[in-house]
Amino acid sequence: MRKLTLIGTALLIAISSYAGGLLTNTNQHIAFLRMIARGASLQIDGVYSNPAGVAFMDNGLYFSLNGQSAYQTRNIDATFALFPEKTRRYKGTAAVPIIPSAYVVYKHDNWALSGFVGVVGGGGKASFDDGLPMFDSRIMAGIYAASQKTITPDMYTINSSVSGRQFIYGAQLGLSYRLNKYLSVFGGGRMDYFSGNYSGYAIAKLKANSATLTDVELDCDQTGWGITPIIGLDYKNGKWNVGVKYEFRTNLNIENTTKKNSDPDGTLADYKDGVNTPNDIPSLLTVAVGYQFTPRLRATAEYHFYDDKHARMANIPGTTTGKQHALTHGTNEFLAGAEYDVNKMITVSAGVQRTDYGLSNDYQSDTSFSCDSYSIGLGGAVKLTPKLTMNVAYFWTNYSKYTKSTDASSRGGYNDTTMSGTDVYSRTNKVFGLGFDYKF
């Protein structure tokens, strides 16, 4: 009985630890995908990237519809003494066939009313069909200890799977005002709605007689909402344009609606029906400087800062400390892009982005990990008619690997096994986008 209890507890801890971190999506318009640095834009995509700048648009009604298709892989190369192959690869896939967004601007004289709807955060949907290292290592260590080292990994099978879904839908509305020929301001807000699901199971069976050692399940929906106040400023002088935007921190709590929970009053208490977990959207500051070198050539340099350390997050596993305190600093992003008008109909563009997180071992986990990255965007715009423009782009991200080594003497050891182990986290990301801008 002691053996079954230890194994079951290990599985429950592994499942209850599944609570992925939030991602803030800045790639709302296809113009971002093809140029990346759009914080000084004076076109309709500025509704999101430079809302004060829309006050410099010509009078009229504008509408934009965009669609993106994103595909990610999330790999974990785990090294653990009880793995027969020593190092085992766990591959997760995250695919979103369509990420839609829509923009509208009505500009009249010095005033501009603008709105936007889209997916402003979340990690899409991810599935680890073969489970995670935190599952397998805990199960193996539990069996090994409970059997007094008489049951080895070749004597049983483990069948586990984990999947999660996270989306934050946003609806933004605001007003821009042109103070004079150089300066405009913006004030507005965005309503954010979180929708997520986390599910997983783990079954351990002896090979000799197929006896089930444990069978654990979790199926939990999570929802929540919050309001993001937004302010902006734009300064335009000749060939120069400077755009500034600040999004305040969004106080966001997500509530569980649980369908299946093997231990709602025990290790899976965090996923008990009705429980709330903090998942704030961090404040965001963007500053961009654009310059028009020639009537055909334009370029922008930009900086983003996400104040992650002051955004409430779920606790570090095994502690009562929020994960935000484990970060060494907020997220810094450096962006640059340029576009060139080939002729009156065709524009080509490209851009780069460097993202630097303040990562640490306590922040990283199998179910929520990030990696510093470089991104490249390529694409163009085609003026199909005097009123209709098509944007098309390809966006690719190259992630640095993150190595997390855990000694047996550290808090609980590797995945609470009291043994040592190492995880190497890596990711890939590819996005294709197509959008249409129309002026009535």
Q: How would you name each of these model-derived features?
A:
Residues 1-19:
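Gram-negative bacterial Sec-dependent N-terminal signal peptides
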Residues 20-37, 41-42, 99, 105-440:
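Outer-membrane beta-barrel porins/channels
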